[in-house]
Amino acid sequence: MAWISLILSLLALSSGAISQAVVTQESALTTSPGETVTLTCRSSTGAVTTSNYANWVQEKPDHLFTGLIGGTNNRAPGVPARFSGSLIGDKAALTITGTQTEDEAMYFCALWYSNHWVFGGGTKLTVLG
C-alpha cells in the first residue's frame, strides 16, 4: 500500500511548498507507437541519487493515478515490463520501451529529501497514432 501513500502525498504536497528543493521535468514529449522514450527528473540540489528513491506516477486523462516505479528502479506489481526506471547522469529517468497509444498520460516524478517528497510538475506524454 506504499503506492497509495505516495499518490496521496502527490495530491497533498504537489506544490512542494515545504521544501527548498525544486524537481524539474520536461513539460511535454511526443513519441510514436513502438518507439522508446525517456522522461527525466532533475533536482535543484544536485545529482539525483539512489537516496532520493525516485518514484514515477502515471496520471491518465480520467485522473486515474498509477504508481509505476519506486526506489529508482523497482517496477510496481502489475506494471508492464516496458516501463523501467534508472539514473542517467545526474537525473532520474523513466524509459518506456515500445511505447503504446495507451501510454499517453501525465507522468510525475517524486524525489525523497530526508523527510518528505517533492514532486515535479509532470511531463505530458503524447503518443501519435
Curated annotation (Swiss-Prot):
Keywords: Adaptive immunity, Immunity, Immunoglobulin, Pyrrolidone carboxylic acid, Signal. The keyword Zinc does not apply. One of its GO terms (cellular component) is immunoglobulin complex. One of its GO terms (biological process) is adaptive immune response. Residues 1-19 form the signal peptide. It comes from the Eukaryota. Pfam families: V-set. InterPro entries: Ig-like_dom, Ig-like_dom_sf, Ig-like_fold, Ig_sub, Ig_V-set, IgV_Light_Chain. Residues 20-125 form the Ig-like domain. The modification Pyrrolidone carboxylic acid is found at Q20. The keyword Transmembrane does not apply. SMART domains: IG, IGv. PANTHER family: IMMUNOGLOBULIN LIGHT CHAIN. This is Ig lambda-1 chain V region S43.
